């Protein structure tokens, strides 16, 4: 009897119910551990909290997490004993040893709280590469300060997406974008671009459709695609295998670890792996080596130069053109555009008049118009 009632409940669950249950893990409280000098590097250009709130409001996220800043392990332990903390961020600058010691101590005492580390600049990364094994015993991921407080929004969203991925894809059929990049410097640069563009495009889709009173815009924004970061071949394959039905795009570097060894063609092999699944998943290779553009073309994948001055625009073009955020382009059997729809309503109307050949799966793939 209870099984039947459960089935009835599931069948009658409305969109609003599903939206409300998405993103059950939200980062509301962040503990920032930084000595006074390191804290100064991020606060010297203005009010830190105001800037964080501004970053959230810029992408229509109306509730920013609260930051509590401390300068020592003793202060951190006091805060942790007094209130619930969702995420710990440790800054490492001139003093690189103390944050590591604090991190290990906190991991022993609070193993379920995610810890991320933020280094002051790219030159500090060389040191952390030499101690990777010890570093990742307590630190989930390393990021590099790029001069913008947007990196804090990205760090919070990175953890939220990772924690909510399994539940949200099963409950709400949420889409997934996979970024494969092992360079801390580059993923610290890419992720802010990706999150900003995904959130902006999601909002444009929401605002382009008639709004109902039963569902707030804030709630609908929860259906934005998850952005998942992998740093080696095996991590990427795991995401592809487990979330293939939800995957709408793969952006991959060319060189990273495969089978534990640096592989100069790991990204090439990954795109081939995606193609072998038989699913239509748009792929983009990104590399500093321009000659890899030829390999990308052979794989029918897009390509961008990692050092391009138009990097942000190139990523925007890929997301709008290939991941379903841009206009829907109707094409004939030769792939030539014959019409376009800018909204769901317009799409429905155009379906009544376009040739049958333009409604085949081949002809209705999202491509740049």
Where are the regions a protein language model picked out?
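Residue-level signal for alpha-helical context at structural boundaries
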Residues: 94, 124, 173, 208, ...
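Hydrophobic beta-strand segments of well-ordered beta-sheets in folded domains
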Residues: 27-33, 85-90, 113-118, 139-142, ...
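Alpha4 helix (beta4-alpha4-beta5 surface) of REC/receiver domains from two-component response regulators
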Residues: 96-101, 105, 117-143, 149-153, ...
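Amphipathic alpha-helical segments that form the core helices of the histone-fold
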Residues: 364-369
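Conserved phosphotransfer microenvironments
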Residues: 6, 10-12, 41-44, 48-53, ...
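Non-catalytic signal-transmission and effector/linker regions of two-component phosphorelay proteins
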Residues: 1-68, 132-226, 233-234, 246, ...
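Structural motif
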Residues: 33-37, 90-94, 118-121, 146-147, ...
């Amino acid at each position: 009897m209870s099984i039947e009632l459960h089935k009835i409940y599931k069948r009658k669950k409305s969109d609003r119910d599903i939206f409300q249950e998405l993103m059950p893990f939200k980062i509301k409280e962040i503990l920032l551990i930084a000595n006074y000098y390191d804290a100064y590097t991020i606060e010297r250009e203005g009010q830190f909290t105001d800037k964080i709130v501004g970053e959230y409001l810029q992408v229509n996220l109306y509730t920013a997490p609260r930051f509590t800043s401390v300068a020592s392990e003793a202060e951190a332990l006091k805060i942790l004993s007094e209130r619930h903390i969702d995420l710990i961020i440790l800054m490492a600058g001139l003093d690189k040893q103390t944050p590591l010691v604090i991190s290990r101590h906190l991991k022993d005492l609070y193993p379920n709280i995610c810890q991320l580390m933020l280094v002051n600049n790219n030159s500090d990364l060389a040191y952390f590469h030499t101690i990777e094994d010890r570093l990742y015993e307590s630190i989930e991921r390393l990021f590099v300060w790029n001069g913008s407080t947007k990196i804090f929004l990205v760090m919070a969203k990175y953890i939220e997406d990772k924690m909510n991925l399994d539940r949200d894809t099963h409950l709400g059929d949420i889409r997934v974008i996979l970024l494969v990049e092992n360079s801390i410097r580059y993923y610290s640069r890419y992720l802010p671009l990706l999150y900003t563009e995904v959130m902006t495009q999601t909002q444009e889709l929401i605002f382009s459709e008639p709004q109902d009173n039963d569902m707030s815009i804030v709630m609908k924004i929860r259906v934005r695609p998850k952005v998942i970061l992998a740093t080696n071949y095996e991590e990427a394959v795991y995401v592809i295998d487990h979330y293939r039905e939800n995957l709408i795009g793969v952006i991959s570097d060319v060189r990273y670890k495969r089978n534990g060894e640096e592989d100069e063609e790991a990204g090439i092999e990954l795109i081939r792996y995606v193609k072998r699944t038989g699913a239509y998943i748009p792929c983009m290779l990104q590399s500093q080596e321009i000659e890899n553009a030829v390999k990308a073309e052979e794989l029918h994948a897009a390509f961008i130069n990692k050092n391009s001055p138009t990097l942000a625009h190139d990523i925007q073009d890929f997301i709008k053109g290939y991941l379903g955020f841009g206009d829907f382009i109707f094409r004939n059997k030769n792939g030539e555009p014959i019409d376009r729809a800018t909204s769901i309503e317009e799409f429905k109307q155009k379906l009544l008049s376009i040739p049958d050949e333009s409604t085949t799966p081949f002809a209705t793939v999202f491509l740049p118009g």
